[in-house]
C-alpha cells in the first residue's frame, strides 16, 4: 500500500485586487460564488480520505479576503477530518489590509499556528507602484494584533529589485523587518511573468528595474545582514530563526509528495504531478474526484532532475546516500563531472557526501541548476 502524503495545500483564488507582478491562479472576488467554492474545496479534500497531515498551507489568491464565517467553515471542516495530534504546522496566508479582528479570532481559535503576511515592501510609494493596497501602518497593526491573539510564528514576504527601488530602500525594508522581531522572512527578487501588468509594461519599455549587478548587490546585503542577526539562510529565498523554518515548504524542496486542493492548485501524488481546473466555475462543475485538468507521470529522468533542482535550493543540499537509495543509481556516474566543475567554480561544496550550494551558488542558482539536466541516453 502506497504511503499517503503528509502535506496538503489548499488554494483560495479570490483577491480584492490584482497585484501588478502576480501570475498565480486568482480572480477578483466581486460576484464570485465564494460559499459554493468553499463547499467544493471541502468536498475535494474529503474525497482523498485523509486522516493525518503533518503540514497544511492555505494560500492564494488571498485567503484573508474570506469572511470570518467562510474561513471558520473551511478550517472546521479540515480539522474535523484530521488527527490534530500529528499536525505540526498549519499556515494561512493573509494580506495586512484584510485582517479584521473577527478573522484573527477565527484563526486563533482554530488549529492554525502560523501566519504568512504578504508585505512585499514597507515603502508606501513602492506599495502603490506595484499594485498593493495596504500601507506600512497596516503591516505594524496586523502584526501587533496577531501577536496579541497568541501567534508567535509569523512570517512575511518581501520583494526586492522592484521598479525604481534603490539599495537604501532595500536596507530600510530589512531593517523594519528586524525591528518587528519576527522569526521568519521570505525575500524574493522580482521576476517578470507573462500575463502580468509589469510584463506588459516591460515589453513597452515602460518599466525601470535595477540592473543585474544591483540585484546581486541587494541579495548579498540581505544574506549578510540577516545572518548577522541570527537568521538561518536555509533556502535560496527563505530565512528563519532556529526552529522556525517552514516545514511545509521544506516538503516541496525535499521533493516529497503532497495534496493540491482547489481551483488551479498543483499536487504530487503517486509519482504524478497534477494541476486542477483553474477557472472557478469549471472547478465547481467537476465532481470532487474529477477536478484535474492535467496529469504528468514523471519519468525517472524527470524525478532525478527535480530532486537536484529542488534539493539544491536548500542550504542543506542533497545527501548522496539518500539520493542513491531513492533512485538506485550511482550519483558519481550521473553527476561526478558536473560536481567537480561546479566545486572548482566555487558554486558548490561537497561536505561529507552532502552536495550544497555556496553563497555564490545561491546568487547564480539557475547557472547551477542547468548543469543537472540529463541527456535521455542516461536511462
UniProtKB/Swiss-Prot annotation:
Gene3D superfamilies: Aldolase class I. Its main location: cytoplasm. It is found in: Cytoplasm; Cell membrane. Keywords: 4Fe-4S, Cell membrane, Chaperone, Cytoplasm, Heme, Iron, Iron-sulfur, Membrane, Metal-binding, S-adenosyl-L-methionine. Belongs to the anaerobic coproporphyrinogen-III oxidase family. HemW subfamily. Homodimer. L.lactis does not synthesize heme, but is able to take it up from growth medium and to incorporate it into cytochromes. Might carry two S-adenosyl-L-methionine binding sites with only one binding to the iron-sulfur cluster. Could serve in the delivery of heme to a membrane-localized target protein. Binds one molecule of heme per monomer, possibly covalently; heme and Fe-S cluster binding are independent. Incubation with the reductant sodium dithionite increases binding. Does not have coproporphyrinogen III dehydrogenase activity in vitro, does not complement an E.coli hemN deletion in vivo. Binds 1 Fe-S cluster, it is probably [4Fe-4S]. The cluster is coordinated with 3 cysteines and an exchangeable S-adenosyl-L-methionine; only dimeric protein has the cluster. This is Heme chaperone HemW. The lineage of its organism: Bacteria, Bacillati, Bacillota, Bacilli, Lactobacillales.
Amino acid at each position: 500500500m502506497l504511503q499517503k502524503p503528509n502535506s496538503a495545500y489548499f488554494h483560495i483564488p479570490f483577491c480584492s485586487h490584482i497585484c501588478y507582478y502576480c501570475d498565480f491562479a486568482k480572480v477578483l472576488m466581486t460576484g464570485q460564488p465564494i460559499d459554493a467554492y468553499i463547499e467544493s474545496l471541502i468536498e475535494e479534500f474529503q474525497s482523498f480520505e485523509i486522516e493525518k497531515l503533518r503540514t497544511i498551507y492555505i494560500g492564494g489568491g488571498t485567503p484573508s479576503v474570506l469572511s470570518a464565517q467562510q474561513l471558520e467553515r473551511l478550517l472546521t471542516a479540515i480539522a474535523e477530518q484530521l488527527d490534530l495530534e500529528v499536525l505540526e504546522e498549519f499556515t494561512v496566508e493573509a494580506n495586512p489590509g484584510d485582517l479584521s479582528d473577527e478573522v484573527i479570532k477565527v484563526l486563533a481559535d482554530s488549529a492554525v499556528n502560523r501566519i504568512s503576511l504578504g508585505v512585499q515592501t514597507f515603502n508606501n510609494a513602492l506599495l502603490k507602484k506595484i499594485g498593493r493596497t495596504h500601507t506600512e501602518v497596516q503591516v505594524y497593526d496586523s502584526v501587533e494584533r496577531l501577536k496579541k491573539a497568541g501567534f508567535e510564528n509569523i512570517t512575511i514576504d518581501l520583494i526586492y529589485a522592484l521598479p525604481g527601488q534603490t539599495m537604501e530602500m532595500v536596507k530600510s525594508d530589512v531593517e523594519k523587518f528586524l525591528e518587528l522581531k519576527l522569526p521568519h522572512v521570505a525575500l524574493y527578487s522580482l521576476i517578470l511573468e507573462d500575463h502580468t501588468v509589469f510584463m506588459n509594461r516591460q515589453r513597452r519599455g515602460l518599466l525601470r528595474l535595477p540592473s543585474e549587478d544591483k540585484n546581486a548587490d541587494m541579495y548579498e546585503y540581505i544574506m549578510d545582514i540577516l545572518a548577522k542577526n541570527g537568521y538561518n539562510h536555509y533556502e535560496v529565498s527563505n530565512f528563519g530563526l532556529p526552529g522556525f523554518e517552514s516545514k511545509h515548504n521544506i516538503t516541496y524542496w525535499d521533493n516529497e509528495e503532497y495534496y493540491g486542493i482547489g481551483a488551479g492548485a498543483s499536487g504530487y501524488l503517486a509519482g504524478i504531478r497534477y494541476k486542477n481546473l483553474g477557472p472557478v466555475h469549471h472547478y465547481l462543475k467537476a465532481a470532487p474526484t474529477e477536478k484535474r485538468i492535467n496529469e504528468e507521470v514523471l519519468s525517472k529522468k524527470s524525478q532525478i532532475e527535480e530532486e537536484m533542482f529542488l534539493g539544491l535550493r536548500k542550504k542543506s543540499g542533497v545527501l548522496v546516500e539518500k539520493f542513491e537509495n531513492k533512485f538506485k543509481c550511482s550519483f558519481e556516474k550521473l553527476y561526478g563531472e558536473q560536481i567537480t566543475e561546479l566545486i572548482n567554480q566555487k558554486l558548490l561544496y561537497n561536505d561529507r557526501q552532502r552536495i550544497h550550494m555556496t553563497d555564490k551558488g545561491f546568487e547564480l542558482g539557475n547557472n547551477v541548476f542547468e548543469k543537472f539536466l540529463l541527456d535521455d541516453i542516461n536511462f
